[in-house]
């Protein structure tokens, strides 16, 4: 129900924030309704699949995802938007391979840890090999460039290794080294480094680097407790760039007020906690890690978007699950919800005796 409520909220705010952007006031809402229908259909299919049967195909799924990320970098196939090549043309629609690649990595990593459960404490099979896979996906995403999604992918991958039983003595130095390299890459990128300096002093940079964030803060301030009313916000009139995508939560705050923003955050929290409560019934390490990784994708992406829009994190283009306009992320969320229903049905069978899913983590 939380996912449905968030999607309905997203449709209402999307229509309000895009009604004046095109000659056809229903242009965006019609496309989003198509995406919602596809996400529901895909989620239903996933909820009926036998995930154990699909496990051997996880390498193929991951390989296809990696090829799709490579295709994005090929001129003529990949589409450059706002200086980044993250999209591919799919007939009349565009797709963002990095969205579905995140889940492909989760699926493959869960399968790998499951079949190598006894070897997860080892250096090579338990750490170096899976890290190479995580690193490959991360590098392909950085090449777009998309540092935020690459960081999200790396964090989720490392969390899964930790839950799968990889040794902290290998993980901690590698994580610190990776964080240092990531910071160095950002420092050498004028655009992304500029976002950080603008974030640190929004008032001084409100005319350029922090303009978008400044307008988002104004939107929240204008909305107050009860909002100015659906369709009555000023930020929908092109003051706030990307108001219907990455910064749509600011429109929620302006038009519906603090109470609705708190309700939306609560819905995300309930959705995540409900999934966590279900993890204890996982019959094996594969199921445990697949669900844990999927929930982490949902939770971290939500937290990053909310942090950016409220000025708690530097500006980063990342969709808000269920609410932002866009098909790729909505399909990803449909798959994740389908996985939740799938595991809920499969793990609730009375004759299914849960086995130990989480290995002891050794330092």
Regions found by a protein language model. Give the residues of each.
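Hydrophobic alpha-helical transmembrane segments of multi-pass inner membrane proteins, especially
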Residues: 2-16, 21-214, 250-308, 335-339, ...
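Long extracytoplasmic/lumenal interhelical loops at the membrane interface
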Residues: 224-259, 282
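Flexible glycine-/small-residue-rich
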Residues: 92, 218, 241
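Extracytoplasmic/periplasmic regions of membrane proteins
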Residues: 214, 218-221, 228-229
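Short, small-residue-rich loop/turn micro-motifs
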Residues: 13, 220, 224, 310
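Transmembrane helix boundary and interhelical junction motifs in multipass membrane proteins
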Residues: 146-151, 227-233, 243-245, 262, ...
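Glycine/serine-rich anion-binding loops at beta->alpha junctions
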Residues: 91-101, 143-145, 224-229, 318-330
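Transmembrane alpha-helices of multi-pass inner-membrane enzymes
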Residues: 313-356
């Amino acid at each position: 129900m939380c996912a449905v409520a968030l999607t309905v909220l997203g449709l209402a705010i999307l229509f309000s924030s895009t009604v004046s952007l095109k000659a056809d006031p229903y242009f965006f809402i019609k496309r989003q309704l198509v995406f919602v229908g596809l996400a529901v259909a895909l989620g239903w299919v996933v909820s009926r699949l036998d995930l154990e049967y699909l496990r051997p195909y996880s390498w193929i799924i991951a390989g296809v995802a990696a090829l799709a990320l490579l295709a994005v970098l090929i001129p003529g196939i990949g589409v450059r938007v706002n200086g980044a090549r993250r999209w591919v043309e799919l007939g009349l629609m565009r797709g963002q391979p990095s969205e579905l690649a995140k889940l492909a990595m989760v699926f493959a990593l869960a399968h790998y840890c499951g079949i190598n459960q006894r070897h997860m404490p080892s250096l090579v099979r338990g750490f170096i090999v899976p890290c190479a896979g995580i690193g490959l996906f991360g590098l392909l995403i950085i090449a777009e460039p998309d540092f935020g999604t690459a960081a999200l992918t790396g964090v989720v991958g490392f969390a899964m290794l930790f839950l799968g039983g990889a040794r902290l003595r290998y993980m901690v130095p590698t994580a610190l080294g990776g964080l240092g390299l990531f910071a160095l890459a950002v420092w050498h990128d004028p655009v992304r480094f500029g976002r950080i300096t603008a974030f640190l002093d929004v008032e001084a940079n409100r005319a350029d680097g922090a303009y978008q964030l400044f307008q988002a803060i104004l939107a929240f301030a204008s909305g107050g407790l009860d909002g100015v009313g659906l369709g009555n916000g000023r930020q929908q009139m092109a003051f706030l760039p990307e108001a219907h995508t990455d910064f749509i939560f600011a429109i929620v705050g302006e038009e519906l007020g603090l109470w609705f923003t708190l309700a939306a955050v609560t819905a995300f929290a309930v959705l995540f906690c409900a999934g966590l409560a279900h993890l204890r019934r996982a019959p094996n390490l594969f199921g445990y890690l697949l669900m844990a990784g999927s929930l982490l994708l949902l939770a971290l992406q939500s937290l990053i978007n909310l942090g950016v829009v409220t000025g708690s994190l530097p500006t980063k283009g990342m969709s808000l699950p269920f609410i932002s306009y866009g098909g790729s992320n909505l399909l990803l969320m449909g798959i994740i919800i389908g996985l939740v229903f799938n595991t809920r049905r499969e793990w609730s069978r009375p004759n299914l005796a849960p086995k130990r899913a989480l290995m002891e983590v050794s330092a």
